[in-house]
Amino acid sequence: PGFEAGIDIKAKYTIFGEGCRGHLGKELIAKYELDKGKDPQHYGIGFKEVWKIKDENHEEGLVIHTNGWPSAKNTPAGSYLYHADNNEVYLGYVVPLDYENPYLSPFEEFQTWKTHPSIRPYLEGGERLTYGARALIKGGLQSLPSMEFPGGVLVGDNAGTLVFSKIKGSHTAMKS
């Protein structure tokens, strides 16, 4: 009970876009040695929230990128806050998964970041509408595996197309 047999995929060409460190992607990279001669991949965890804020706190088009605080010097975390239309802001925080402190809570770091004097005023009196978290692949071009193999191709985070330094993930996934 509860078991369902897998399916056979039969196609001339299959596009695999299952996200960061996807199960099939890992198997395909290993089977076809798509990462041969590449640097090891690096991973992070990212948190994102969408807020509805007061009209007087909203500056449509404003973009804030930060790095560092509240993370320790040896934990290169980064964050963003984007003012969108309709008095909404998108904010996020990314922490690499190779952090040294076993007591570090990336979620708590994100919550602390929102109290910074450059961030808090925008959120005061606002309401969080949605939130989420996900794994991120952030090794860069030197870690990017070959994306094509016999009968298929890897796309997006399955291949590692995120440009972490420029915070370009959706853009590069669509282009892949």
Task: Please give the residue ranges for each predicted region.
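Predominantly flavin-linked oxidoreductase catalytic cores and closely associated redox partners
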Residues: P1-P121
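FAD/FMN-dependent oxidoreductases across multiple families
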Residues: N101-P102, P106-S176
